[in-house]
C-alpha cells in the first residue's frame, strides 16, 4: 500500500518523525506549535518544526512553557537527538532567519513568504528522508496568491505540482479521515458551478483508480442529485454518467458501489457499509466529514511520494494572538499521521 509513498519506511520499529510547517505566521499556526511543544503528544512520535523565530516570539507570552521546550537549530539532529540534560526538546528550523515584527491576525507579504519558505523547507526534509511525514498548518491561499504566487490554490496542488503530478483526480486526491468515516473528493477547490461540470465519467474513473491504488477498500460513490436522481425524476446524471462509471470500475475489479443517495451514503459509511465515500464536490464531502469528526478530521493527500497530512481548519485570523487557539485538531492529525505511517490506516487499506 502507498500511504503517500514511502510512509512507514522505518516506523514499524521506531518512532515516526513528523515535520510540521508553520502555516501563515499571522494565523494561529505559531500558537498551535507552542501548545504542542508545551505538552508533547507522546512517545510514539518525534516532532520537528519549520517555523520562524519571529513568529513564535510574537506569541511566546501566550504559551511560555512551549517556548522553553524549543531548540533552534541550523540542521535537524539525528533522530532522537534533541535532548538537553535529559529533557526532550523540539528542533526548530527557521526558514527565513530574518528579524521582523509579526502581527497576529493580519497576513502581509512577509507572512505569505514565510509560509511558502517553511513549506518548501519542510518538504525538502521529508524528501531527504529526514522525516517520515509532513504535517502542514493552515496558510492563507488568497494572501499567498496576492503577495507571492499568483494562481496559488492551496497546499494540495502546490505539493503535487512540485512532485510532477499533473492532474487532480487521476494523479492525486484530497481525502479526509474521521474516526468512523473516510471521504475523498472528486473535485476540490472549485466554484460549485464549475465543479459540477467536472463530474464526468472519465473523472470518476480516474478518481476511483487513484483511490484504489493508494488506499483500497470498499468505495461508495455519492450521487449528485437528491435521492440519487429518483430514477431520473430529479436529474439524470446518475443514470447517464455515474452508474456507467461504477459498472466500468467493477469490470476492472474494483470494489465500488453506487451511485448512492447523498443524504444516506455518509451515514452508511459510518455504519460500516463502505470504507470510503467518493464525494463529487468539496462541500458535499466536507460538511459530512467535519460534522462526523467534530473538528478532528485529518486532511490526507493521496498520490504524493511522501506522507502529507493537515488539519481540517483554517488560519483563524480572527482569534490569532488572543491565546484561545485549540490544538485538539492538530493533536488528532498527529495521531492519525502516526497510524498512517505505521500502515494502521486507512480503514480497508490495501495490504499489497
Segments the model singles out, each with a brief description of its role:
Residues 2-237, 243-352:
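Anion-binding alpha/beta catalytic cores of soluble intermediary-metabolism enzymes, centered on
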